[in-house]
């Protein structure tokens, strides 16, 4: 059974007369970007239908495994570019109007400085590639924490709900069981639970849902610097830039996360530094492949070792990293769906975002694909006139694989 048939059956009873349409309850597993975005999209869809004189067809609940939204930090930054219009389409107007409050350097945006795509040679400090952003291009390099806070507006999130099992009590319901003993029954269950998705594991099995670890290691850092120490970075780009080492291999990314108040000359700016290297024998003279250290002093020492022959501005950034920097080890992984390994769920379960198609962060596409997943899923769920849209007439993305 497809999502379409299930929604028709729940909302309209297919073949039966109902004085009041039933509501479809959607159980959202995961309160990250895609889970919150789906919830906001359902809010907007309900409001639109009510404004048209129809009953709001959807209810939903959000279930997060952690005990708070930022229990594990919330991440650093993300870029929405080719999916920006879909983001506007999904969000209620009062939230879409505030998207650019979440950017790392809001004054640059206000001044029309959309930036460039710049890739530096780490040995010379000069651009190996610099492409100016064309006029009219829209995109937002956002603080992930601020963006998630925006998406949480007016949402009720059930925390400490770590999914343990999924069952099917009736022909048109699905039930989520949580480790704390709680349960939630709905008509659709959407797995928005990230890279190590429990929903994906249920649908594809433990072995077929394993991520592939790539031969790359990465450290993601958040540091604060006096603004005057970042003037060279601002000259490269007011938002972010990338860089690579053509001699020893290695990748670097810089992004502004938080800027001091406008006009401040003594304030500090929060920035993101991302560094990765190949996991191979002999790298930087190490006999064995180099895993990232787990303790901060050793992590900072390793980064300085990598940056020894790098040019400014990156050299001084690395050597000047404060001792209170936040450094996280990032697993560079991917997962591709294979429907040959998929168990049938009668249209009651699907996945979005990293749960559906985990990819590496180097192209910065994860968030954009997650936004488009949600937009397409909402299009599949939205009624057309007095009946749901026929999913057979809508292009189905990989992630809405149960459509």
Curated annotation (Swiss-Prot):
Cofactor needs: FAD
Biological pathway: Secondary metabolite biosynthesis
Induction: Expression is positively regulated by the azaterrilone A cluster-specific transcription factor tazR.
GO molecular-function term, one example from the UniProt record: monooxygenase activity
InterPro entries given in the database record: FAD/NAD-bd_sf
Domain of life: Eukaryota
Keyword Nuclease: no
Region forming the signal peptide: none
Endoplasmic reticulum is among the record's keywords: no
UniProt binding sites for FAD: 75, 144, 354, 367
Annotated EC: 1.-.-.-
Keywords, alphabetical: FAD, Flavoprotein, Monooxygenase, Oxidoreductase
Role: FAD-dependent monooxygenase; part of the gene cluster that mediates the biosynthesis of azaterrilone A and other azaphilones, a class of fungal metabolites characterized by a highly oxygenated pyrano-quinone bicyclic core and exhibiting a broad range of bioactivities. The first step of the pathway begins with the non-reducing polyketide synthase tazA that assembles one acetyl-CoA starter unit, five malonyl-CoA units, and catalyzes a series of Claisen condensations, methylation, PT-mediated cyclization, and finally releases the first hexaketide precursor through the R-domain.
Family listed: Belongs to the paxM FAD-dependent monooxygenase family.
PANTHER family membership: FAD-BINDING DOMAIN-CONTAINING PROTEIN-RELATED (PTHR47178:SF1), MONOOXYGENASE, FAD-BINDING (PTHR47178)
Name this polypeptide is given: FAD-dependent monooxygenase tazP
Originating organism: Aspergillus terreus (strain NIH 2624 / FGSC A1156)
Phylogenetic lineage: Eukaryota, Fungi, Dikarya, Ascomycota, Pezizomycotina
Gene that specifies this protein: tazP
């Amino acid at each position: 059974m497809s999502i379409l048939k299930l929604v028709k059956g729940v909302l309209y009873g297919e073949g039966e007369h109902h004085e009041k349409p039933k509501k479809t309850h959607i159980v959202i597993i995961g309160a990250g970007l895609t889970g919150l975005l789906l919830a906001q999209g359902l809010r907007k869809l309900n409001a639109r239908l009510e404004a048209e004189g129809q009953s709001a067809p959807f209810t939903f609940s959000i279930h997060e495994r952690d005990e708070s939204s930022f229990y594990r930090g919330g991440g650093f930054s993300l870029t929405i570019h080719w999916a920006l219009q879909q983001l506007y389409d999904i969000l209620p107007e009062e939230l879409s109007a505030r998207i650019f409050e979440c950017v790392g350097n809001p004054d640059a945006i206000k001044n029309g400085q959309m930036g460039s795509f710049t890739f530096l040679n780490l040995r010379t400090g000069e651009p190996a590639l610099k492409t100016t952003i064309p006029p009219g291009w829209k995109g937002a390099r956002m603080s992930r924490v601020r963006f998630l806070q925006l998406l949480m507006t007016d949402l009720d999130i059930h925390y400490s709900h770590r999914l343990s099992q999924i069952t099917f009590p009736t022909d048109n319901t699905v039930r989520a069981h949580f480790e704390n003993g709680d349960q939630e029954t709905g008509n659709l269950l959407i797995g928005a639970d990230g890279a190590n998705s429990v929903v994906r594991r249920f649908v594809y099995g433990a072995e077929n849902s394993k991520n592939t670890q790539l031969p790359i290691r990465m450290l993601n850092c958040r540091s604060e610097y006096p603004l005057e120490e970042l003037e060279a970075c601002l000259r490269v780009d007011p938002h972010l830039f990338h860089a690579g080492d053509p001699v020893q291999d290695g990748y670097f990314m810089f992004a502004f996360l938080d800027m001091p108040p406008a006009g401040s000359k003594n304030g500090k700016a929060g920035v993101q530094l991302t560094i990765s290297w190949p996991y191979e024998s002999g790298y930087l003279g190490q006999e064995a492949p180099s895993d990232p250290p787990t303790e901060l002093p050793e992590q900072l020492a390793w980064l300085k070792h990598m940056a020894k022959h790098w040019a400014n501005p990156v050299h001084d950034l690395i050597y000047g990293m404060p001792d209170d920097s936040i450094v996280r080890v990032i697993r560079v992984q991917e997962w591709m769906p294979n429907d040959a390994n998929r168990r049938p769920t009668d249209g009651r379960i699907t996945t979005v975002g990293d749960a559906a198609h985990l990819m590496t962060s180097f192209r910065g596409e994860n968030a954009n694909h997650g936004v488009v997943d949600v937009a397409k899923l909402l299009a599949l769920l939205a009624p057309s006139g007095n009946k749901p849209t026929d999913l057979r007439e809508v292009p189905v993305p990989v992630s809405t694989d149960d459509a």
